[in-house]
Amino acid sequence: MSTCKICKTELTWENKTLCIRCGVEICEDCSTRNKFKCDKCADKLKIKIPDVIRRSSIEDYKSCPYYFKLHVIDGNEPRQNVLARLGSDLHDLYEHIQRGDVEIKDIDTQTDWILSHIEEDYPEEDMNRVEQRARISNQSFIKLLPTLTNKAIAFEERINFSIGEGIPQVTIAYDRLEEDENGDLHIVDWKTGKVMSGKKLTTDLQPALYLQAVKEKYGKMPKSFKLVYVSDIDKQGNYKERTFHSIDGNKFVCKVGNKEYIQDISEQIKVVQKLFAQIKQGKFSIPAKPDYFKCKMCDFKEKGLCSGNDTQNWININEERQKYGW
């Protein structure tokens, strides 16, 4: 007499089947529950979810769950595009200037050093385009500094915080946290990309997660969150910005012209909780309507890890069928 390796139920010709990976005998009920595998083999295939997930990776999951899987779950590192690399290096430079480690008069010399190293790492890129963005960003940062009159209490601080039990923590890192004369907090974060506009001002997760992170760390919700786009300038050469002001401590409004865009912190947290639940369930399909430009430029496609939206979905489905004997 044989018994199921999982539940110890007596096996008969009516209920006996085999684990599709190792071949041990299990009952049909356990087989169905474990996707045709014994407990030992099922554990080996369980998705290892990180304890902490970056805010930017959450946005990646919203955009393309399969990209998130390849990067965060499988551990494949995408190559930074040249402008993202520039943005990262300039952020480091601006932090050192704020801290007093680098004098503002040396910003061009430091930028020349940054550009020389980028050119070494990206010999195929048009460095005139990269240098132009760097110089515009520096000019904007020089204009920005005198306007930052509140007391700075933290630079480039990373905060991990929980949004619920049984799901990963979120981690964020802002550029500058200020305190005004009334003791109220204000977040300032600069960007080297294009200014945020339209519906994205309501749906983007960065404002809500940054505000909630500071509340968790400092015990009170900031009064504002400002995004400064140092490389995106208007016809007068002034940098563009978007500022979210507190309405009631949980909702923030960003006014652009005659339009108002609301960020509801509680609702945005619920969005992230739902996304984390989907991640735990192993939902990593490519979206039906992906960002085709992002898909075309994806480094994972260049590395042969993804065949693009139309082809990769079929590959993934067929791999699942082979795994589970569908």
Language model regions located:
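Short metal-coordination and nucleic-acid-contact micro-motifs, chiefly zinc-binding Cys/His arrays
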Residues: 1, 15, 23, 34, ...
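Short Cys/His-rich Zn2+-coordinating modules
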Residues: 2-3, 22-26, 275-284
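Ser/Thr-centric signal marking residues that sit
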Residues: 3, 9, 192
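Short cysteine-rich clusters marking metal-coordination/redox-active sites
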Residues: 4-7, 19-22, 38-41, 295
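Canonical RING-type zinc finger of E3 ubiquitin-protein ligases
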Residues: 11-22, 30
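Short functional micro-motifs and their immediate structural scaffolds
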Residues: 12, 27, 35, 46, ...
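Cys/His-coordinated zinc-finger cores
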Residues: 24-42
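RecB-family 4Fe-4S metal-dependent nuclease core
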Residues: 43-326
